[in-house]
Amino acid sequence: MLAAGAAAGWFLHVRTAGRDVVGSPSVEFVTTAGPAAVTTTPAATAPARPTLPPVIWPTYGLDNRRLRTFPGGPKPPFRTLWSYRGGSLLEFPPTLAYGRLTISTNRGRLVSLDAATGKARWTFESGRCVAASPAVANRVVYASFMNRPPCNASGSALDGQVVAFDALTGKVRWRATVGVNESSPLVAGGLVTVGDWNGDVTALDARTGVQRWRFHTGDKVKGAPALADGRLVIGSYDGSVVALNPQTGALLWKASAQERIGSRGTFYATAALAFGRVYVGATDGKVYSFGAESGKLRWSQSTGGYVYASAAIWRQSVLVGSYSGSFFSLDAATGAVNWRFRAPGPISGSAVVIGDVVYVATLARTTYALDAATGKLLWTFPDGQYGAAITDGTHLYLVGTTRLYAMVPRG
């Protein structure tokens, strides 16, 4: 009875959604070179010391626009060089900087691994739950921590933390208390910005951890902030997406998911910013495109299931998965479906594009490599649920359920 009721509820939820809105390439869609066009440059960081390897993948989604697209890199099939056993769920991908892969486990361990060998260089046991990627800038790792276990606890007394570490030694530089925090940090303009379960978006001084501003949304904030062209964009469980001034927290605009029988979908996913647009999925099963300058709805596209995954932006397409088990390539200007890949399991994790190959994992614990242009299946790997992969241009670092794999092409 419960299963039947849930199925009926979901069917009603989908069928009563607002109609999909078809977009136009002539309205708030920028393809020429400029600040609103797609770039693949990682988030800006100060130059590393000459003796240190470079910063390659400094933040969740590769850059602060959260584009999730790396220009070039290894191609499948792959073989494994080494693997690191995390001991608990690896829900979000690592960063890669100074020759170190830094990743968090769901049970609160933050570990910095030698990218060449997989050996741990330092480890921090927080005693808290974690559901976020760290960020790296200026030889500092910034990490988000949730409440202490149980991880599904609720209550006003719970809190979270943002902690800053020396990237090479793991020494704690500062820690700040925020609400329960599963928002991957955004580092830009001397600030570290996160969202939390209290509905707050908080900016902390990157050097000291002192709060600089706070903005309250209407409900929980679980996604990471995205930043482009002087606008910090983030979604909320109240069904809204807001654009804020990144230095002051002042509200620039507020947009909403489409209404259905008196309610709206909520935004868990992290937005991607490209072409003068905001691209983000919602729990009403739709992917939305809003104008980055105006906040106006430019298109919406139904997927048949919750969209917890964040989108990757490749060329002029939006690549995103759905709980329906379908993975979509959507036209970035109009929302039209370019192609669809049907996987045998719900898709909750976010995809990443490396070269012209898109990687996505399913809750059935399989990672798929697809041709980004056509959706053709190129390779599968029997592990992975959420985190997909990152690269340094030579290796593929694939996030399994509890293991991180370093891989190179076969042959």
Label the predicted regions.
Residues D114-T117, D166-T169, D205-G209, N245-G249, ...:
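Short loop/turn segments that connect beta-strands within beta-propeller blades
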Residues V30-T45:
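Extracellular mucin-like PTS domains
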Residues N64-R65, R109, N147-A153, D200, ...:
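Short glycine/acidic-enriched loop and turn motifs that connect beta-strands
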Residues A43-T80:
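Blade/loop signatures of beta-propeller domains
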Residues D20-G23, W82-L96, W122-A137, S144-Q161, ...:
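Extracytoplasmic beta-rich repeat domains
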Residues G5-E28, D284:
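C-terminal region of N-terminal signal peptides and the immediate post-cleavage residues
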Residues T105-A115:
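Beta-propeller domains
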